[in-house]
Amino acid sequence: MNEKVSNPFPANHIGMHFCPSEVQSSILNSGLFRVIEDDVDPKDVDADYVFDCRGKPKDFSEYKKLKNPINAAILAKPNWNTLECLWSRHIATPDGWTFIIPTHPDSPSHDYCVGYCYNSDITPPNEAEENFLSQFDVDVKKHVKYKNYVAKNPIDDRIILNGNRLYFLEPLESSSVQTYLEWA
């Protein structure tokens, strides 16, 4: 055991939150990778392996629908300092649940670090927003609806689906990471 590293949390039991645009910028500008910004088919990339992280698919014909009680979220900017609590919080609500992610106010993700998750087939969006605002001091930024899905074929020869290209269950799941840990 490395005496300088103390981590009692197994990787499949913890999660990490990060701002996607900041991570992407950091990786692309690191100089560690040859970056070609273009709209390409992963099959045309000259590499031994390609990790397809292009986000949510436009066509869901190659995906299985996953059952989940929520299918929508209202994203908001908090009117308080979320950094006073250094871990994410999950609060049960009348319509589903709310997540609060401690996010630095300068981060592009700060405007969306509080999310009210609910089922739009049961609760109308205006009612969900009313309930959200009655429980939390936030400025609503946007409403999103989403599908819960997993790829039927996550690995196709040398192309490996990852992130939202592989799987989406709900806003706070790091689903693809956990899925690969379980498959391994």
Task: Cite the ranges covered by each PLM segment.
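N-terminal FAD cofactor-binding segment of flavoenzymes
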Residues: 1-4
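Amphipathic heptad-repeat coiled-coil/leucine-zipper-like oligomerization helices
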Residues: 7-8
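Active-site rim elements
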Residues: 11-17
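Residue-level detector of alpha-helix boundaries and kinks
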Residues: 12, 85, 169-172
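Generic secondary-structure boundary/loop-capping signal
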Residues: 15, 71, 165-166
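Predominantly flavin-linked oxidoreductase catalytic cores and closely associated redox partners
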Residues: 18-136
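FAD/FMN-dependent oxidoreductases across multiple families
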Residues: 104-106, 117-184
